[in-house]
UniProtKB/Swiss-Prot annotation:
Residues 1-102 are annotated as: Interaction with NSMCE3. This is Non-structural maintenance of chromosomes element 1 homolog. The lineage of its organism: Eukaryota, Metazoa, Chordata, Craniata, Vertebrata. Keywords: Chromosome, DNA damage, DNA recombination, DNA repair, Metal-binding, Nucleus, Telomere, Transferase, Ubl conjugation, Ubl conjugation pathway, Zinc, Zinc-finger. InterPro entries: Nse1, Nse1_RING_C4HC3-type, PE/DAG-bd, WH-like_DNA-bd_sf, Znf_RING, Znf_RING/FYVE/PHD. Component of the SMC5-SMC6 complex which consists at least of SMC5, SMC6, NSMCE2, NSMCE1, NSMCE4A or EID3 and NSMCE3. NSMCE1, NSMCE4A or EID3 and NSMCE3 probably form a subcomplex that bridges the head domains of the SMC5-SMC6 heterodimer. Interacts with NSMCE3.
Length: 266
């Protein structure tokens, strides 16, 4: 079997198809990545034993290393869902988006990024972003056009929109963390628990330390009276639930069952 005789660091058609499809999507949640992996095995090597996802991705990364590309794993800041993105390590700046967006569109993203990083909440309002349209480099852009470009950023999973405000998608954080740290050293916020870049989260009202929502959920998971890990003062915020992939999977199965039932009834 190809799966059992393959040497480490060599890509098969299974790996190549997986990589090609991941490149098409840009970023996927972990359950989607597992489904994609199984699909690629069924298409190219039906009889092989499916590698553990971590080993499978490590194998691809060992080949991509010389190209300065890597499949990186992260989590969504709002609810802790594991995600995977194909990251270009050769350039950390906004310029890595240049193949999909025009110069003035990239500059709009930079303006939005700066507002998001500078904000206390990790969000920038569409009004504040659109007010900077006159300052864009390159071809002039009307506000109506800028609104459409912001939606393109959302569709491409660079930004997330919630009630007229924008924040960074997990894909943007995975791809641009180094660039953000270097470009906005005075505005950058770090999580006190995982020590990685924090865009949105909770903060201690006494000492000011910040924590990602998923880190808050895990840290205070079995604590009746949550206290700040730094100053030990009372933690005044609501504690979010820890993301449970099994519960999510069951909800997905239930949802698809209801959908198929509705389809049969029509």
């Amino acid at each position: 079997m190809q799966g059992s005789t393959r040497r480490a660091g060599a890509m098969t058609d299974v790996h190549r198809r997986f990589l090609q499809l991941l490149m098409t999507h840009g970023v996927l949640e972990e359950w989607e990545v597992r489904r994609l992996q199984n699909h690629c095995y069924k298409v190219h090597d039906r009889n092989a034993t499916v590698d553990k996802l971590e080993d499978f991705i490590n194998n691809i990364n060992s080949v991509l290393e010389s190209l300065y590309i890597e499949i990186k794993k992260g989590i969504t800041e709002d609810d802790g869902r594991p995600i995977y993105a194909l990251v270009n390590l050769a350039t950390t700046s906004v310029s890595k988006m240049a193949t999909d967006f025009a110069e003035n569109e990239l500059d709009l993203f930079r303006k939005a990024l700066e507002l998001i990083v500078d904000s206390e909440t990790g969000f920038a309002s569409s009004t504040n972003i659109l007010n900077l349209v006159d300052q864009l480099k390159g071809k002039k852009m009307r506000k109506k056009e800028a609104e459409q470009v912001l939606q393109k950023f959302v569709q491409s999973k660079w930004l997330i929109e919630k009630e007229g405000e924008f924040t960074l998608h997990g894909r943007a954080i995975l791809e641009m963390e180094q660039f953000i740290r270097e470009s906005y050293p005075d505005a950058v916020k770090m999580c006190n628990i995982c020590h990685s870049l924090l865009i949105q989260g909770q903060s201690c009202e006494t000492c000011g330390i910040r924590m990602h929502l998923p880190c808050v959920a895990k840290y205070f998971q079995s604590t009746a009276e949550p206290r700040c890990p730094h100053c030990n003062d009372y933690w005044p915020h609501d504690i979010p639930e820890v993301f449970d992939p099994e519960k999510e999977r069951e909800a997905g199965i239930s949802k698809s069952s209801r959908k198929s039932l509705r389809t049969r009834q029509h």
